[in-house]
Amino acid sequence: MARLLEEHGFETKTNVIVQGNCVEQEIDVVAERDGERYMIECKFHNIPVYTGLKEAMYTYARFLDVEKHGFTQPWIFTNTKFSEEAKKYAGCVGIKLTGWSYPEKEGIEVLLESKGLYPITILRIDKEVLDELVRAGLVFCRDVVSAGEEKLREIGLSAKKAREVIAEAKKVIG
């Protein structure tokens, strides 16, 4: 998410440890732009479920604990949809939500496609290869193509596998 937000003009930091009023909190992403400082919670699911009220309440409680560190708004990013209860609660307490097709015409898929960013998770690759690519900072298909075969071999892929992954990433990009 940090890389996506950077493409949209945000300055970001990931996995930031902040001492809250009550306990130490790890913030998934801290994003800043135009004088706003967001505490972002990333909720990603491998199976098509929704992000619900519990996650929204949990995020807001964490925000209240660390608000004194200059955070202006909590923000939840998810690769799924939000439940109606989560939307209602978020609207009431001021949580920004970004998910699949939400907000309308500003959902995560719009943010990605508007910058030509296609996550490597859409490639047909096994988990081990995916994990290696992510560890190397290659999270978008264009990163894989730009890195080239030599870089993919450096991170542990065979020459054949590297060429296959690059070819598939090129097809996705178009």
From Swiss-Prot:
UniProt cross-references to CDD domains, sorted A to Z: Af1548-like
Name of this chain's protein: Uncharacterized protein AF_1548
A GO MF label: nucleotide binding
InterPro entries: AF1548-like_C, DNA_repair_Rad51/TF_NusA_a-hlx, Restrct_endonuc-II-like, Restrct_endonuc_IV_Mrr, tRNA_endonuc-like_dom_sf
Pfam families: AF1548-like_C, Mrr_cat
GO biological-process terms attached to the record: DNA restriction-modification system
